């Protein structure tokens, strides 16, 4: 046999693959997990939730005085909007109009109703889904968090005017920060204030949101613009909140309807045009009976602060993600204290910059002291931005996302922050002085009225002070607008002491205490809008350092060329450009034509151009002409792009001496002479470092090729340490090898072995490529099959050998092979990491040159085997991280040897072996090793366990006494076509009903002992032909059953008739402890014409108390019985059993072992 043919067959043998097992990676964990098990329809129509918590009001009665009197504790419904002060779009306003106002590319958070998990869609995608007819919607999606402030929709929606008076965002948060907000989305990095005031909720029919409390204990206003809603409301009592928290932490939200666990719950239906106000802390669930469009918003206020703090603490304990929490919560609390102190005492604790921007304090002072004449001077005075503003005007706290160790010293060492002592407040009128301003209750008292706080506000402010004081330093989140938090706390305490005896009746003024001064009276000077640079803002309590700002580096001195002009395009000639998409890689899966969302906007991994060219429109930066090298080969007229300075010129247009460095992998690319000369010294130093690294790599790669007594690395000056493949056009193979000319008098055998080794490597590569080409041409199916190299590209790991020209000091025509690792992250081949492989001299023979030719040939054959094995070992080390063989290189013989070893290992030992390497992982997952899988009595069946079952394809699966759901079992049986034995003892009918479909495998054994909720109708559903695909098969899916276990079920003779009809092969039947079975049941099983009369071999009727001695007369008819268990049957006597045995012992011997256990003696 020719050596070449042998090598080809060897390469084909290396590519032997086994049949791929079925793995559905597209199934998400959410689809596997069991979800809602309670009946939502029953919750919608039952009269159980008939409590009365909601108050119906007229809009004119909802004012600040009402809130001051009651504290906004009860849910409110307004049947019409008269007197509320709300403004809504036209009645025909649709979701498509919402898209036009907020933008079709606006990303919205969409909730999958079935899994209660969130995904993202664009408004255009959501609109298409919303307008899809109901019967064509595959899933139920719900949008409940589209915040539309700072969009065109903002001015079309106005919330109740009373909410404007009490909302902390409008009255407590520095208004200049809110006015500086320009971002319309809720991106936290661009958020200047808690952006939660206006939401648009869009729900389709059937959407359900489980019980929840709005984030941060916020209250909610809610207007039904189109459609309707159904609410379940639970009051926020201490007991109910404890139940709610335990319910959240239990993870059983899909199994437990919280309204059934509390003593009082109200279901209320909201119709179109209703406005609903939900107070702080109320636990509620929402159902959408028809497609609905709702406008609403969240707000914090001062009349229920304890409840708001309590809900925020619950969110802390239940680990609610920061994305779903109230932004800047504790920063808002600090501003609340500051605003109360200022509005009651005229003393501000804001920094000077914040006073200017939000309070306009400088202008107010000048206006009061100087009159109109000074106002002109104020107008003439330029308003300058403090240098601190670029760092400190962000609402992020000093203590959040920074270095906490030096926090106290750093924040108080700023020169503009003055520490104010609160101890001598009674005698010093300048105690509240900041930035030159002096305010004191005695020096500048309020002139209009005596202030009285409601008991709701007093209690809330006390709780707020206690909470902020109890926070550790890294969680205080003091905003940068507060100059001295300690002085602020001291002032609030004094203020609360002074107002502790406020008259409750005088506090009902109908006017909020905290209001911003009006700017129109102060003649605020106009100025152009300036976007204030801010530091990056993250969630206030994430404990994660803020992302470091990338310093802006000065631009290079090279000419600025437009990025669009420099962007390269496809060559349309290489193999990658002319082939189609693979449909397998992550880019293809993202494409819309393959069913993906189409977000990446990237081409297939296999279609990434190997040699992208410059676009036709690019011109020379010196002469302005386009590429003149379309027909000629003149290098001087060819446009070249420098890979360093990105300058595009004709080489002939450069008027300078020196040489450039041509990039042979990328067309029209070089290092221009200017950049090449400047960087030559650095390149030389870098090249030395790379050579030293390459030597270390060579020692690892070629270690199997050396003997134990050889040094690990060849002498660095040895010419044979570099493999040179020299192109020879005369050679029939196109490539010949030669040793280095300076090798000297080395061993002849060593040199010849080197050449043979090099030749074998090259021929093996060429033969593999030719085989791939032939397989592609001879593909009879016409379908595109991926080569091994392409499959490896998609997998992300493969090793190929590419030929490159060496460095300048080597001969110009020599080519150096380099080992190239193709990874999925590489954009194309030129970016792949490269490792230079050097071949060292082979082991010096012990027998010298005088030995005969025969000995030399024998030695060559031995070396070929050694080289092949060493080569495989080296490749495995590079590619497998320690594994002995990889996908294409694994040996079938080696696999079978190891399989014979793995058969003796236990399940735990197999799992340990799977951790060794990828190959062992694949071998240990072989279904021959996992014919039986036992998960009985597992507390929870997780998605990972289900995926593991699918990989192993068991024949017998035990899920007894588990809480597996119907969806999980359906997912399993659809993907286990070879399943024969299924044990579901102790499971519920809701799960077992998954076997009533046409996808149920043909089982041999089914164990339903002591299953919950299974009676005659359920057995009928199991045994009758499935109705989900009529006309497909009119036979039962359990027709091959040989072992049926029904112990402990409430079944009657109707079930036995079904068994006789649909199970002709049944040999073992377990009917123990079925209390409804009688003697007539035994008569049915053994009647003339029944299949069980001849097929049954084992019958278990233990514990059936209604059986009598007459049963034994009927059981004599069973032809091939080997075991009858009648233990526990109180009405059957031992004497009758003995008589029964004597009748059966005519042809075979039977014995009575134990009490009433009849067995055949084999």
Swiss-Prot record:
Residues 367-389, 532-557, 704-789, 839-887 are annotated as: Disordered. The modification Phosphoserine is found at residues 28, 390, 394, 558, 692, 718, 731, 825, 832, 869, 883. The modification Phosphothreonine is found at residues 550, 632, 713. Zn(2+) 4 binds at residues 642, 645, 672, 675. It catalyses: N(6),N(6)-dimethyl-L-lysyl(36)-[histone H3] + 2 2-oxoglutarate + 2 O2 = L-lysyl(36)-[histone H3] + 2 formaldehyde + 2 succinate + 2 CO2. GO terms for biological process: chromatin remodeling; circadian regulation of gene expression; double-strand break repair via nonhomologous end joining; negative regulation of transcription by competitive promoter binding; regulation of circadian rhythm; regulation of transcription by RNA polymerase II. A zinc finger (CXXC-type) spans 564-610. SUPFAM superfamilies: Clavaminate synthase-like, FYVE/PHD zinc finger, RNI-like. Substrate binds at residues 209, 229. LRR repeats lie at residues 961-982, 984-1010, 1048-1073, 1074-1103, 1104-1128, 1129-1156. Pfam families: F-box-like, JHD, PHD_4, zf-CXXC. It is found in: Nucleus, Nucleoplasm; Chromosome. Zn(2+) 1 binds at residues 571, 574, 577, 609. Changing residue 212 to A: Abolishes histone demethylase activity. No loss of its ability to repress the transcriptional activator activity of the CLOCK-BMAL1 heterodimer. This is Lysine-specific demethylase 2A. The gene is KDM2A.
């Amino acid at each position: 046999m020719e050596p070449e043919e042998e090598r080809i067959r060897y390469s084909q043998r290396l590519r032997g693959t086994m049949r791929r097992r079925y793995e559905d990676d597209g199934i998400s964990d959410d689809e596997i997990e069991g979800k809602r098990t309670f009946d939502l329809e029953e919750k919608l129509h039952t009269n159980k939730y008939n409590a009365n918590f909601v108050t119906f009001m007229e809009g004119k009665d909802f004012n600040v005085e009402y809130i001051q009197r009651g504290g906004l504790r009860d849910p409110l419904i307004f049947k019409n909007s008269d007197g509320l002060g709300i403004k809504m779009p036209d009645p025909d306003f649709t979701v498509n109009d919402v898209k036009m106002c907020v933008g079709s590319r606006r990303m919205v958070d969409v909730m999958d109703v079935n899994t209660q998990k969130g995904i993202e869609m664009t408004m255009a995608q959501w609109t298409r889904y919303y307008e899809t007819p109901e019967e064509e919607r595959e899933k139920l999606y719900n949008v409940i968090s589209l915040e539309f402030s700072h969009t065109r929709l903002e001015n079309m929606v106005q919330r109740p005017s009373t909410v404007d008076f009490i909302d902390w965002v409008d009255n407590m948060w520095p208004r200049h920060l809110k006015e500086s907000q320009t971002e319309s989305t809720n991106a936290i990095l661009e958020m200047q204030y808690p952006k939660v005031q206006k939401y648009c909720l869009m729900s389709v029919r059937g959407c359900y949101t489980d019980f929840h409390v709005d984030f941060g204990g916020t209250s909610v206003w809610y207007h039904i613009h189109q459609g309707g809603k159904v609410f379940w409301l639970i009051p926020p009592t201490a007991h109910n909140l404890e139940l709610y928290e335990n319910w959240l932490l239990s993870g059983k939200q899909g199994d437990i309807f919280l309204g059934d666990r509390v003593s009082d719950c109200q279901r209320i239906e909201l119709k179109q045009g209703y406005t609903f106000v939900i107070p702080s802390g109320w636990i509620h669930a929402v159902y959408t009976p028809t497609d609905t469009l709702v406008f609403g918003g969240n707000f914090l206020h001062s009349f229920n602060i304890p409840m708001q703090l309590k809900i925020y603490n619950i969110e802390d304990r239940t680990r609610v993600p920061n994305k779903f929490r109230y932004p800047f919560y504790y920063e808002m609390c600090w501003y609340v204290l500051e605003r109360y102190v200022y509005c009651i005492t005229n003393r501000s604790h804001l920094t000077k910059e914040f006073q200017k921007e939000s309070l306009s304090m400088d202008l107010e002072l000048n206006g009061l002291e100087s009159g109109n004449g000074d106002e002109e001077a104020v107008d003439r005075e330029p308003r300058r931005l403090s240098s601190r503003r670029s760092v400190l005007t962000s609402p992020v706290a000093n203590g959040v996302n920074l270095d906490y160790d030096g926090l106290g010293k750093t924040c108080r060492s700023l020169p503009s922050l003055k520490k104010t002592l609160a101890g001598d407040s009674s005698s010093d009128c300048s105690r509240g002085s900041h930035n030159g301003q002096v305010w004191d209750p005695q020096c500048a008292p309020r002139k209009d009225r005596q202030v009285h706080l409601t008991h709701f506000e007093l209690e809330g402010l006390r709780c707020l002070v206690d909470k902020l004081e109890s926070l550790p330093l890294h969680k205080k989140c003091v905003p940068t607008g507060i100059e001295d938090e300690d002085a602020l706390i001291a002032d609030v305490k004094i203020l609360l002491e002074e107002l502790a005896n406020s008259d409750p009746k005088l506090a009902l003024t109908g006017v909020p205490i905290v209001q911003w001064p009006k700017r129109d009276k102060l003649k605020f000077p106009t100025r152009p809008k300036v976007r204030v640079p801010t530091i990056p803002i993250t969630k206030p309590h994430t404990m994660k350092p803020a992302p470091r700002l990338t310093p802006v580096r000065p631009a290079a001195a090279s000419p600025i060329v437009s990025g669009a002009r420099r962007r390269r395009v496809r060559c349309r000639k290489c193999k990658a450009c002319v082939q189609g998409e693979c449909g397998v890689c992550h880019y293809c899966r993202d494409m819309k034509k393959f069913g993906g969302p189409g977000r990446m906007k990237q081409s297939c991994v296999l279609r990434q151009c190997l040699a992208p060219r410059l676009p036709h429109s690019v011109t020379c930066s010196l002469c302005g002409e386009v590429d003149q090298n379309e027909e000629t080969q003149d290098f001087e007229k060819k446009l070249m792009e420098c890979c360093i300075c990105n300058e595009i010129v004709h080489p002939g247009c450069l008027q300078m001496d020196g040489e450039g460095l041509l990039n042979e992998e990328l067309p029209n690319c070089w290092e221009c002479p200017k950049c090449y000369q400047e960087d030559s010294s650095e390149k030389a130093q870098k090249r030395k470092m790379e050579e030293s690294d390459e030597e270390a790599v060579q020692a690892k790669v070629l270690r199997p090729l050396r003997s134990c007594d050889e040094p690990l690395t060849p002498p660095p000056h040895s010419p044979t340490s570099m493999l040179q493949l020299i192109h020879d056009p005369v050679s029939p193979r196109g490539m010949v090898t030669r040793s280095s000319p300076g090798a000297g008098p080395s061993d002849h055998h060593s040199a010849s072995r080197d050449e043979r080794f090099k030749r074998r490597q090259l021929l093996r590569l060429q033969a593999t490529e030719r085989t791939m080409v032939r397989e592609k041409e001879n593909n009879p199916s016409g379908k595109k099959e991926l080569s091994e190299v392409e499959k490896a590209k998609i997998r992300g790991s493969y090793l190929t050998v590419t030929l490159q020209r060496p460095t300048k000091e080597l001969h110009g025509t020599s080519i150096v092979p380099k080992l190239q690792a193709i990874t999925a992250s590489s954009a194309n081949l030129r970016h792949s990491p490269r490792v230079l492989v050097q071949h060292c001299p082979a082991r010096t023979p012990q027998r010298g040159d005088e030995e005969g030719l025969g000995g030399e040939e024998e030695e060559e054959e031995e070396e070929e085997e050694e080289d092949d094995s060493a080569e495989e070992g080296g490749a495995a080390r590079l590619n497998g991280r320690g594994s002995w063989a990889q996908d294409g290189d694994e040996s079938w013989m080696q696999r079978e040897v190891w399989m014979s070893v793995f058969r003796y290992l236990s399940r735990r030992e197999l799992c340990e072996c799977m951790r060794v390497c990828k190959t062992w992982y694949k071998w240990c997952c072989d279904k021959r090793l996992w014919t039986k899988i036992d998960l009985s009595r597992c507390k929870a069946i997780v998605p990972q366990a289900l995926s593991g079952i699918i990989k192993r394809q068991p024949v017998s699966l035990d899920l007894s006494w588990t809480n597996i759901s119907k969806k999980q079992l359906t997912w399993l049986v659809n993907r286990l076509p070879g399943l024969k034995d299924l044990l579901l003892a102790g499971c519920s009918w809701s799960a077992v009903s998954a076997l009533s479909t046409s996808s149920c495998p043909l089982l041999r054994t089914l164990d339903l002992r002591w299953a919950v909720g299974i009676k005659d109708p359920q057995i009928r559903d199991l045994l009758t032909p499935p109705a989900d695909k009529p006309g497909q098969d009119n036979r039962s899916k359990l027709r091959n059953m040989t072992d049926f276990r029904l112990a402990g079920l409430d079944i009657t003779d109707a079930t036995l008739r079904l068994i006789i009809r649909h199970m002709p092969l049944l040999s073992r039947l377990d009917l123990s402890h079925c209390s409804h079975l009688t003697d007539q049941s035994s008569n049915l099983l053994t009647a003339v014409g029944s299949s069980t009369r001849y097929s049954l071999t084992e019958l278990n009727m233990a514990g059936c108390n209604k059986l009598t001695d007459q049963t034994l007369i009927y059981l004599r008819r069973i032809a091939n019985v080997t075991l009858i268990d009648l233990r526990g049957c109180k009405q059957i006597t031992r004497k009758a059993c003995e008589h029964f045995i004597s009748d059966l012992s005519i042809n075979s011997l039977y014995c009575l072992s134990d009490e009433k256990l009849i067995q055949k003696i084999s």
